């Protein structure tokens, strides 16, 4: 009897800390410019989160506070130029207001981190997961991310993995106002990569939810040539540099290298020489 194909779901809470801070202020993180950072630690402090609205201006999620200040100044200089050089008549943190009135300067809220609050919200969301999946099938990866093995639940609920993930995400949104993204795969790696890379580049469904799926075959078709390679789970700049030094720039390159025959330059042994036992993360 063939082994059952397993279904894994990864769920990531979108800009979690920033979304919680917006929720506490009855604001929408999709339209509110907000960063989570402690300005008393100097402007070199790293922002724990940036709201999706502010990210849309090109500000990365883990920027230093001085980078946010600099980018906002650049944006306002450009807004003033497009407004004929006139002085601003006001300022706003809301993207709708900023689009409607060019005489407003872009502003943002700086929220001091409140870890106890984030843990409380994360626990509330974990309890939503428990409505659908037993704790032994949930792996908490971080405060805002989980993996779930949903294989044994699909027949019970008479749902596909996509339908179950969508139902869970919609309940999170309804109960906590926190948006989430999901990846689905036949193993943990594929569901994580589906969430991290593919879901970010697809249009949301009619409920505003992004869910991406990968199989071994679709992974090869969609992502073997994807760059930068650092977008992939567990491939940091150090790994990417070592791979580039031997002419490997994509996951397709790595896969072909791992299939090389003994005695050839590109083979599994090359990866083990470069990374030791950690080569197993790539092969």
Regions from the language model: what does each represent?
Residues 1-282:
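Gly/Gly-Pro- and Ser/Thr-rich, intrinsically disordered tail segments characteristic of DNA damage-repair
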């Amino acid at each position: 009897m063939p082994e059952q194909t397993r279904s894994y779901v990864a769920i990531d809470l979108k800009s979690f800390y920033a979304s919680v801070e917006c929720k506490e202020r009855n604001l929408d993180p999709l339209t509110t410019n907000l960063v989570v950072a402690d300005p008393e630690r100097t402007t070199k402090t790293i922002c724990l989160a940036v709201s999706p609205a502010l990210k849309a201006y090109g500000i990365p999620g883990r920027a230093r506070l001085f980078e946010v200040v600099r980018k906002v100044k650049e944006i306002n200089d450009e807004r003033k130029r497009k407004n004929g050089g006139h002085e601003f008549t006001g300022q706003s943190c809301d993207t709708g207001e900023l689009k409607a009135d060019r005489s407003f300067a872009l502003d943002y809220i700086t929220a001091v981190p409140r870890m106890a609050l984030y843990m409380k919200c994360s626990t509330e969301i974990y309890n939503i997961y428990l409505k659908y999946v037993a704790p032994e099938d949930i792996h908490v990866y971080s405060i805002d991310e989980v993996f779930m093995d949903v294989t044994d639940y699909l027949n019970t609920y008479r749902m596909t993995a996509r339908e179950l993930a969508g139902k869970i995400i919609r309940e999170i949104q309804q109960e906590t106002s926190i948006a989430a993204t999901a990846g689905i795969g036949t193993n943990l790696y594929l569901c994580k990569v589906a969430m991290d890379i593919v879901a970010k580049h697809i249009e949301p469904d009619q409920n505003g939810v992004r869910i991406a799926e990968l199989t071994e075959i679709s992974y090869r078709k969609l992502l073997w040539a994807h760059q930068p390679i650092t977008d992939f789970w567990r491939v940091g700049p150090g790994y990417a540099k070592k791979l580039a030094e031997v002419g490997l720039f994509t996951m397709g390159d790595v896969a072909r290298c791992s299939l090389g025959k003994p005695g050839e330059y590109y083979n599994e042994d090359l990866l083990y020489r470069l990374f030791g036992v950690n080569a197993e993360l790539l092969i």
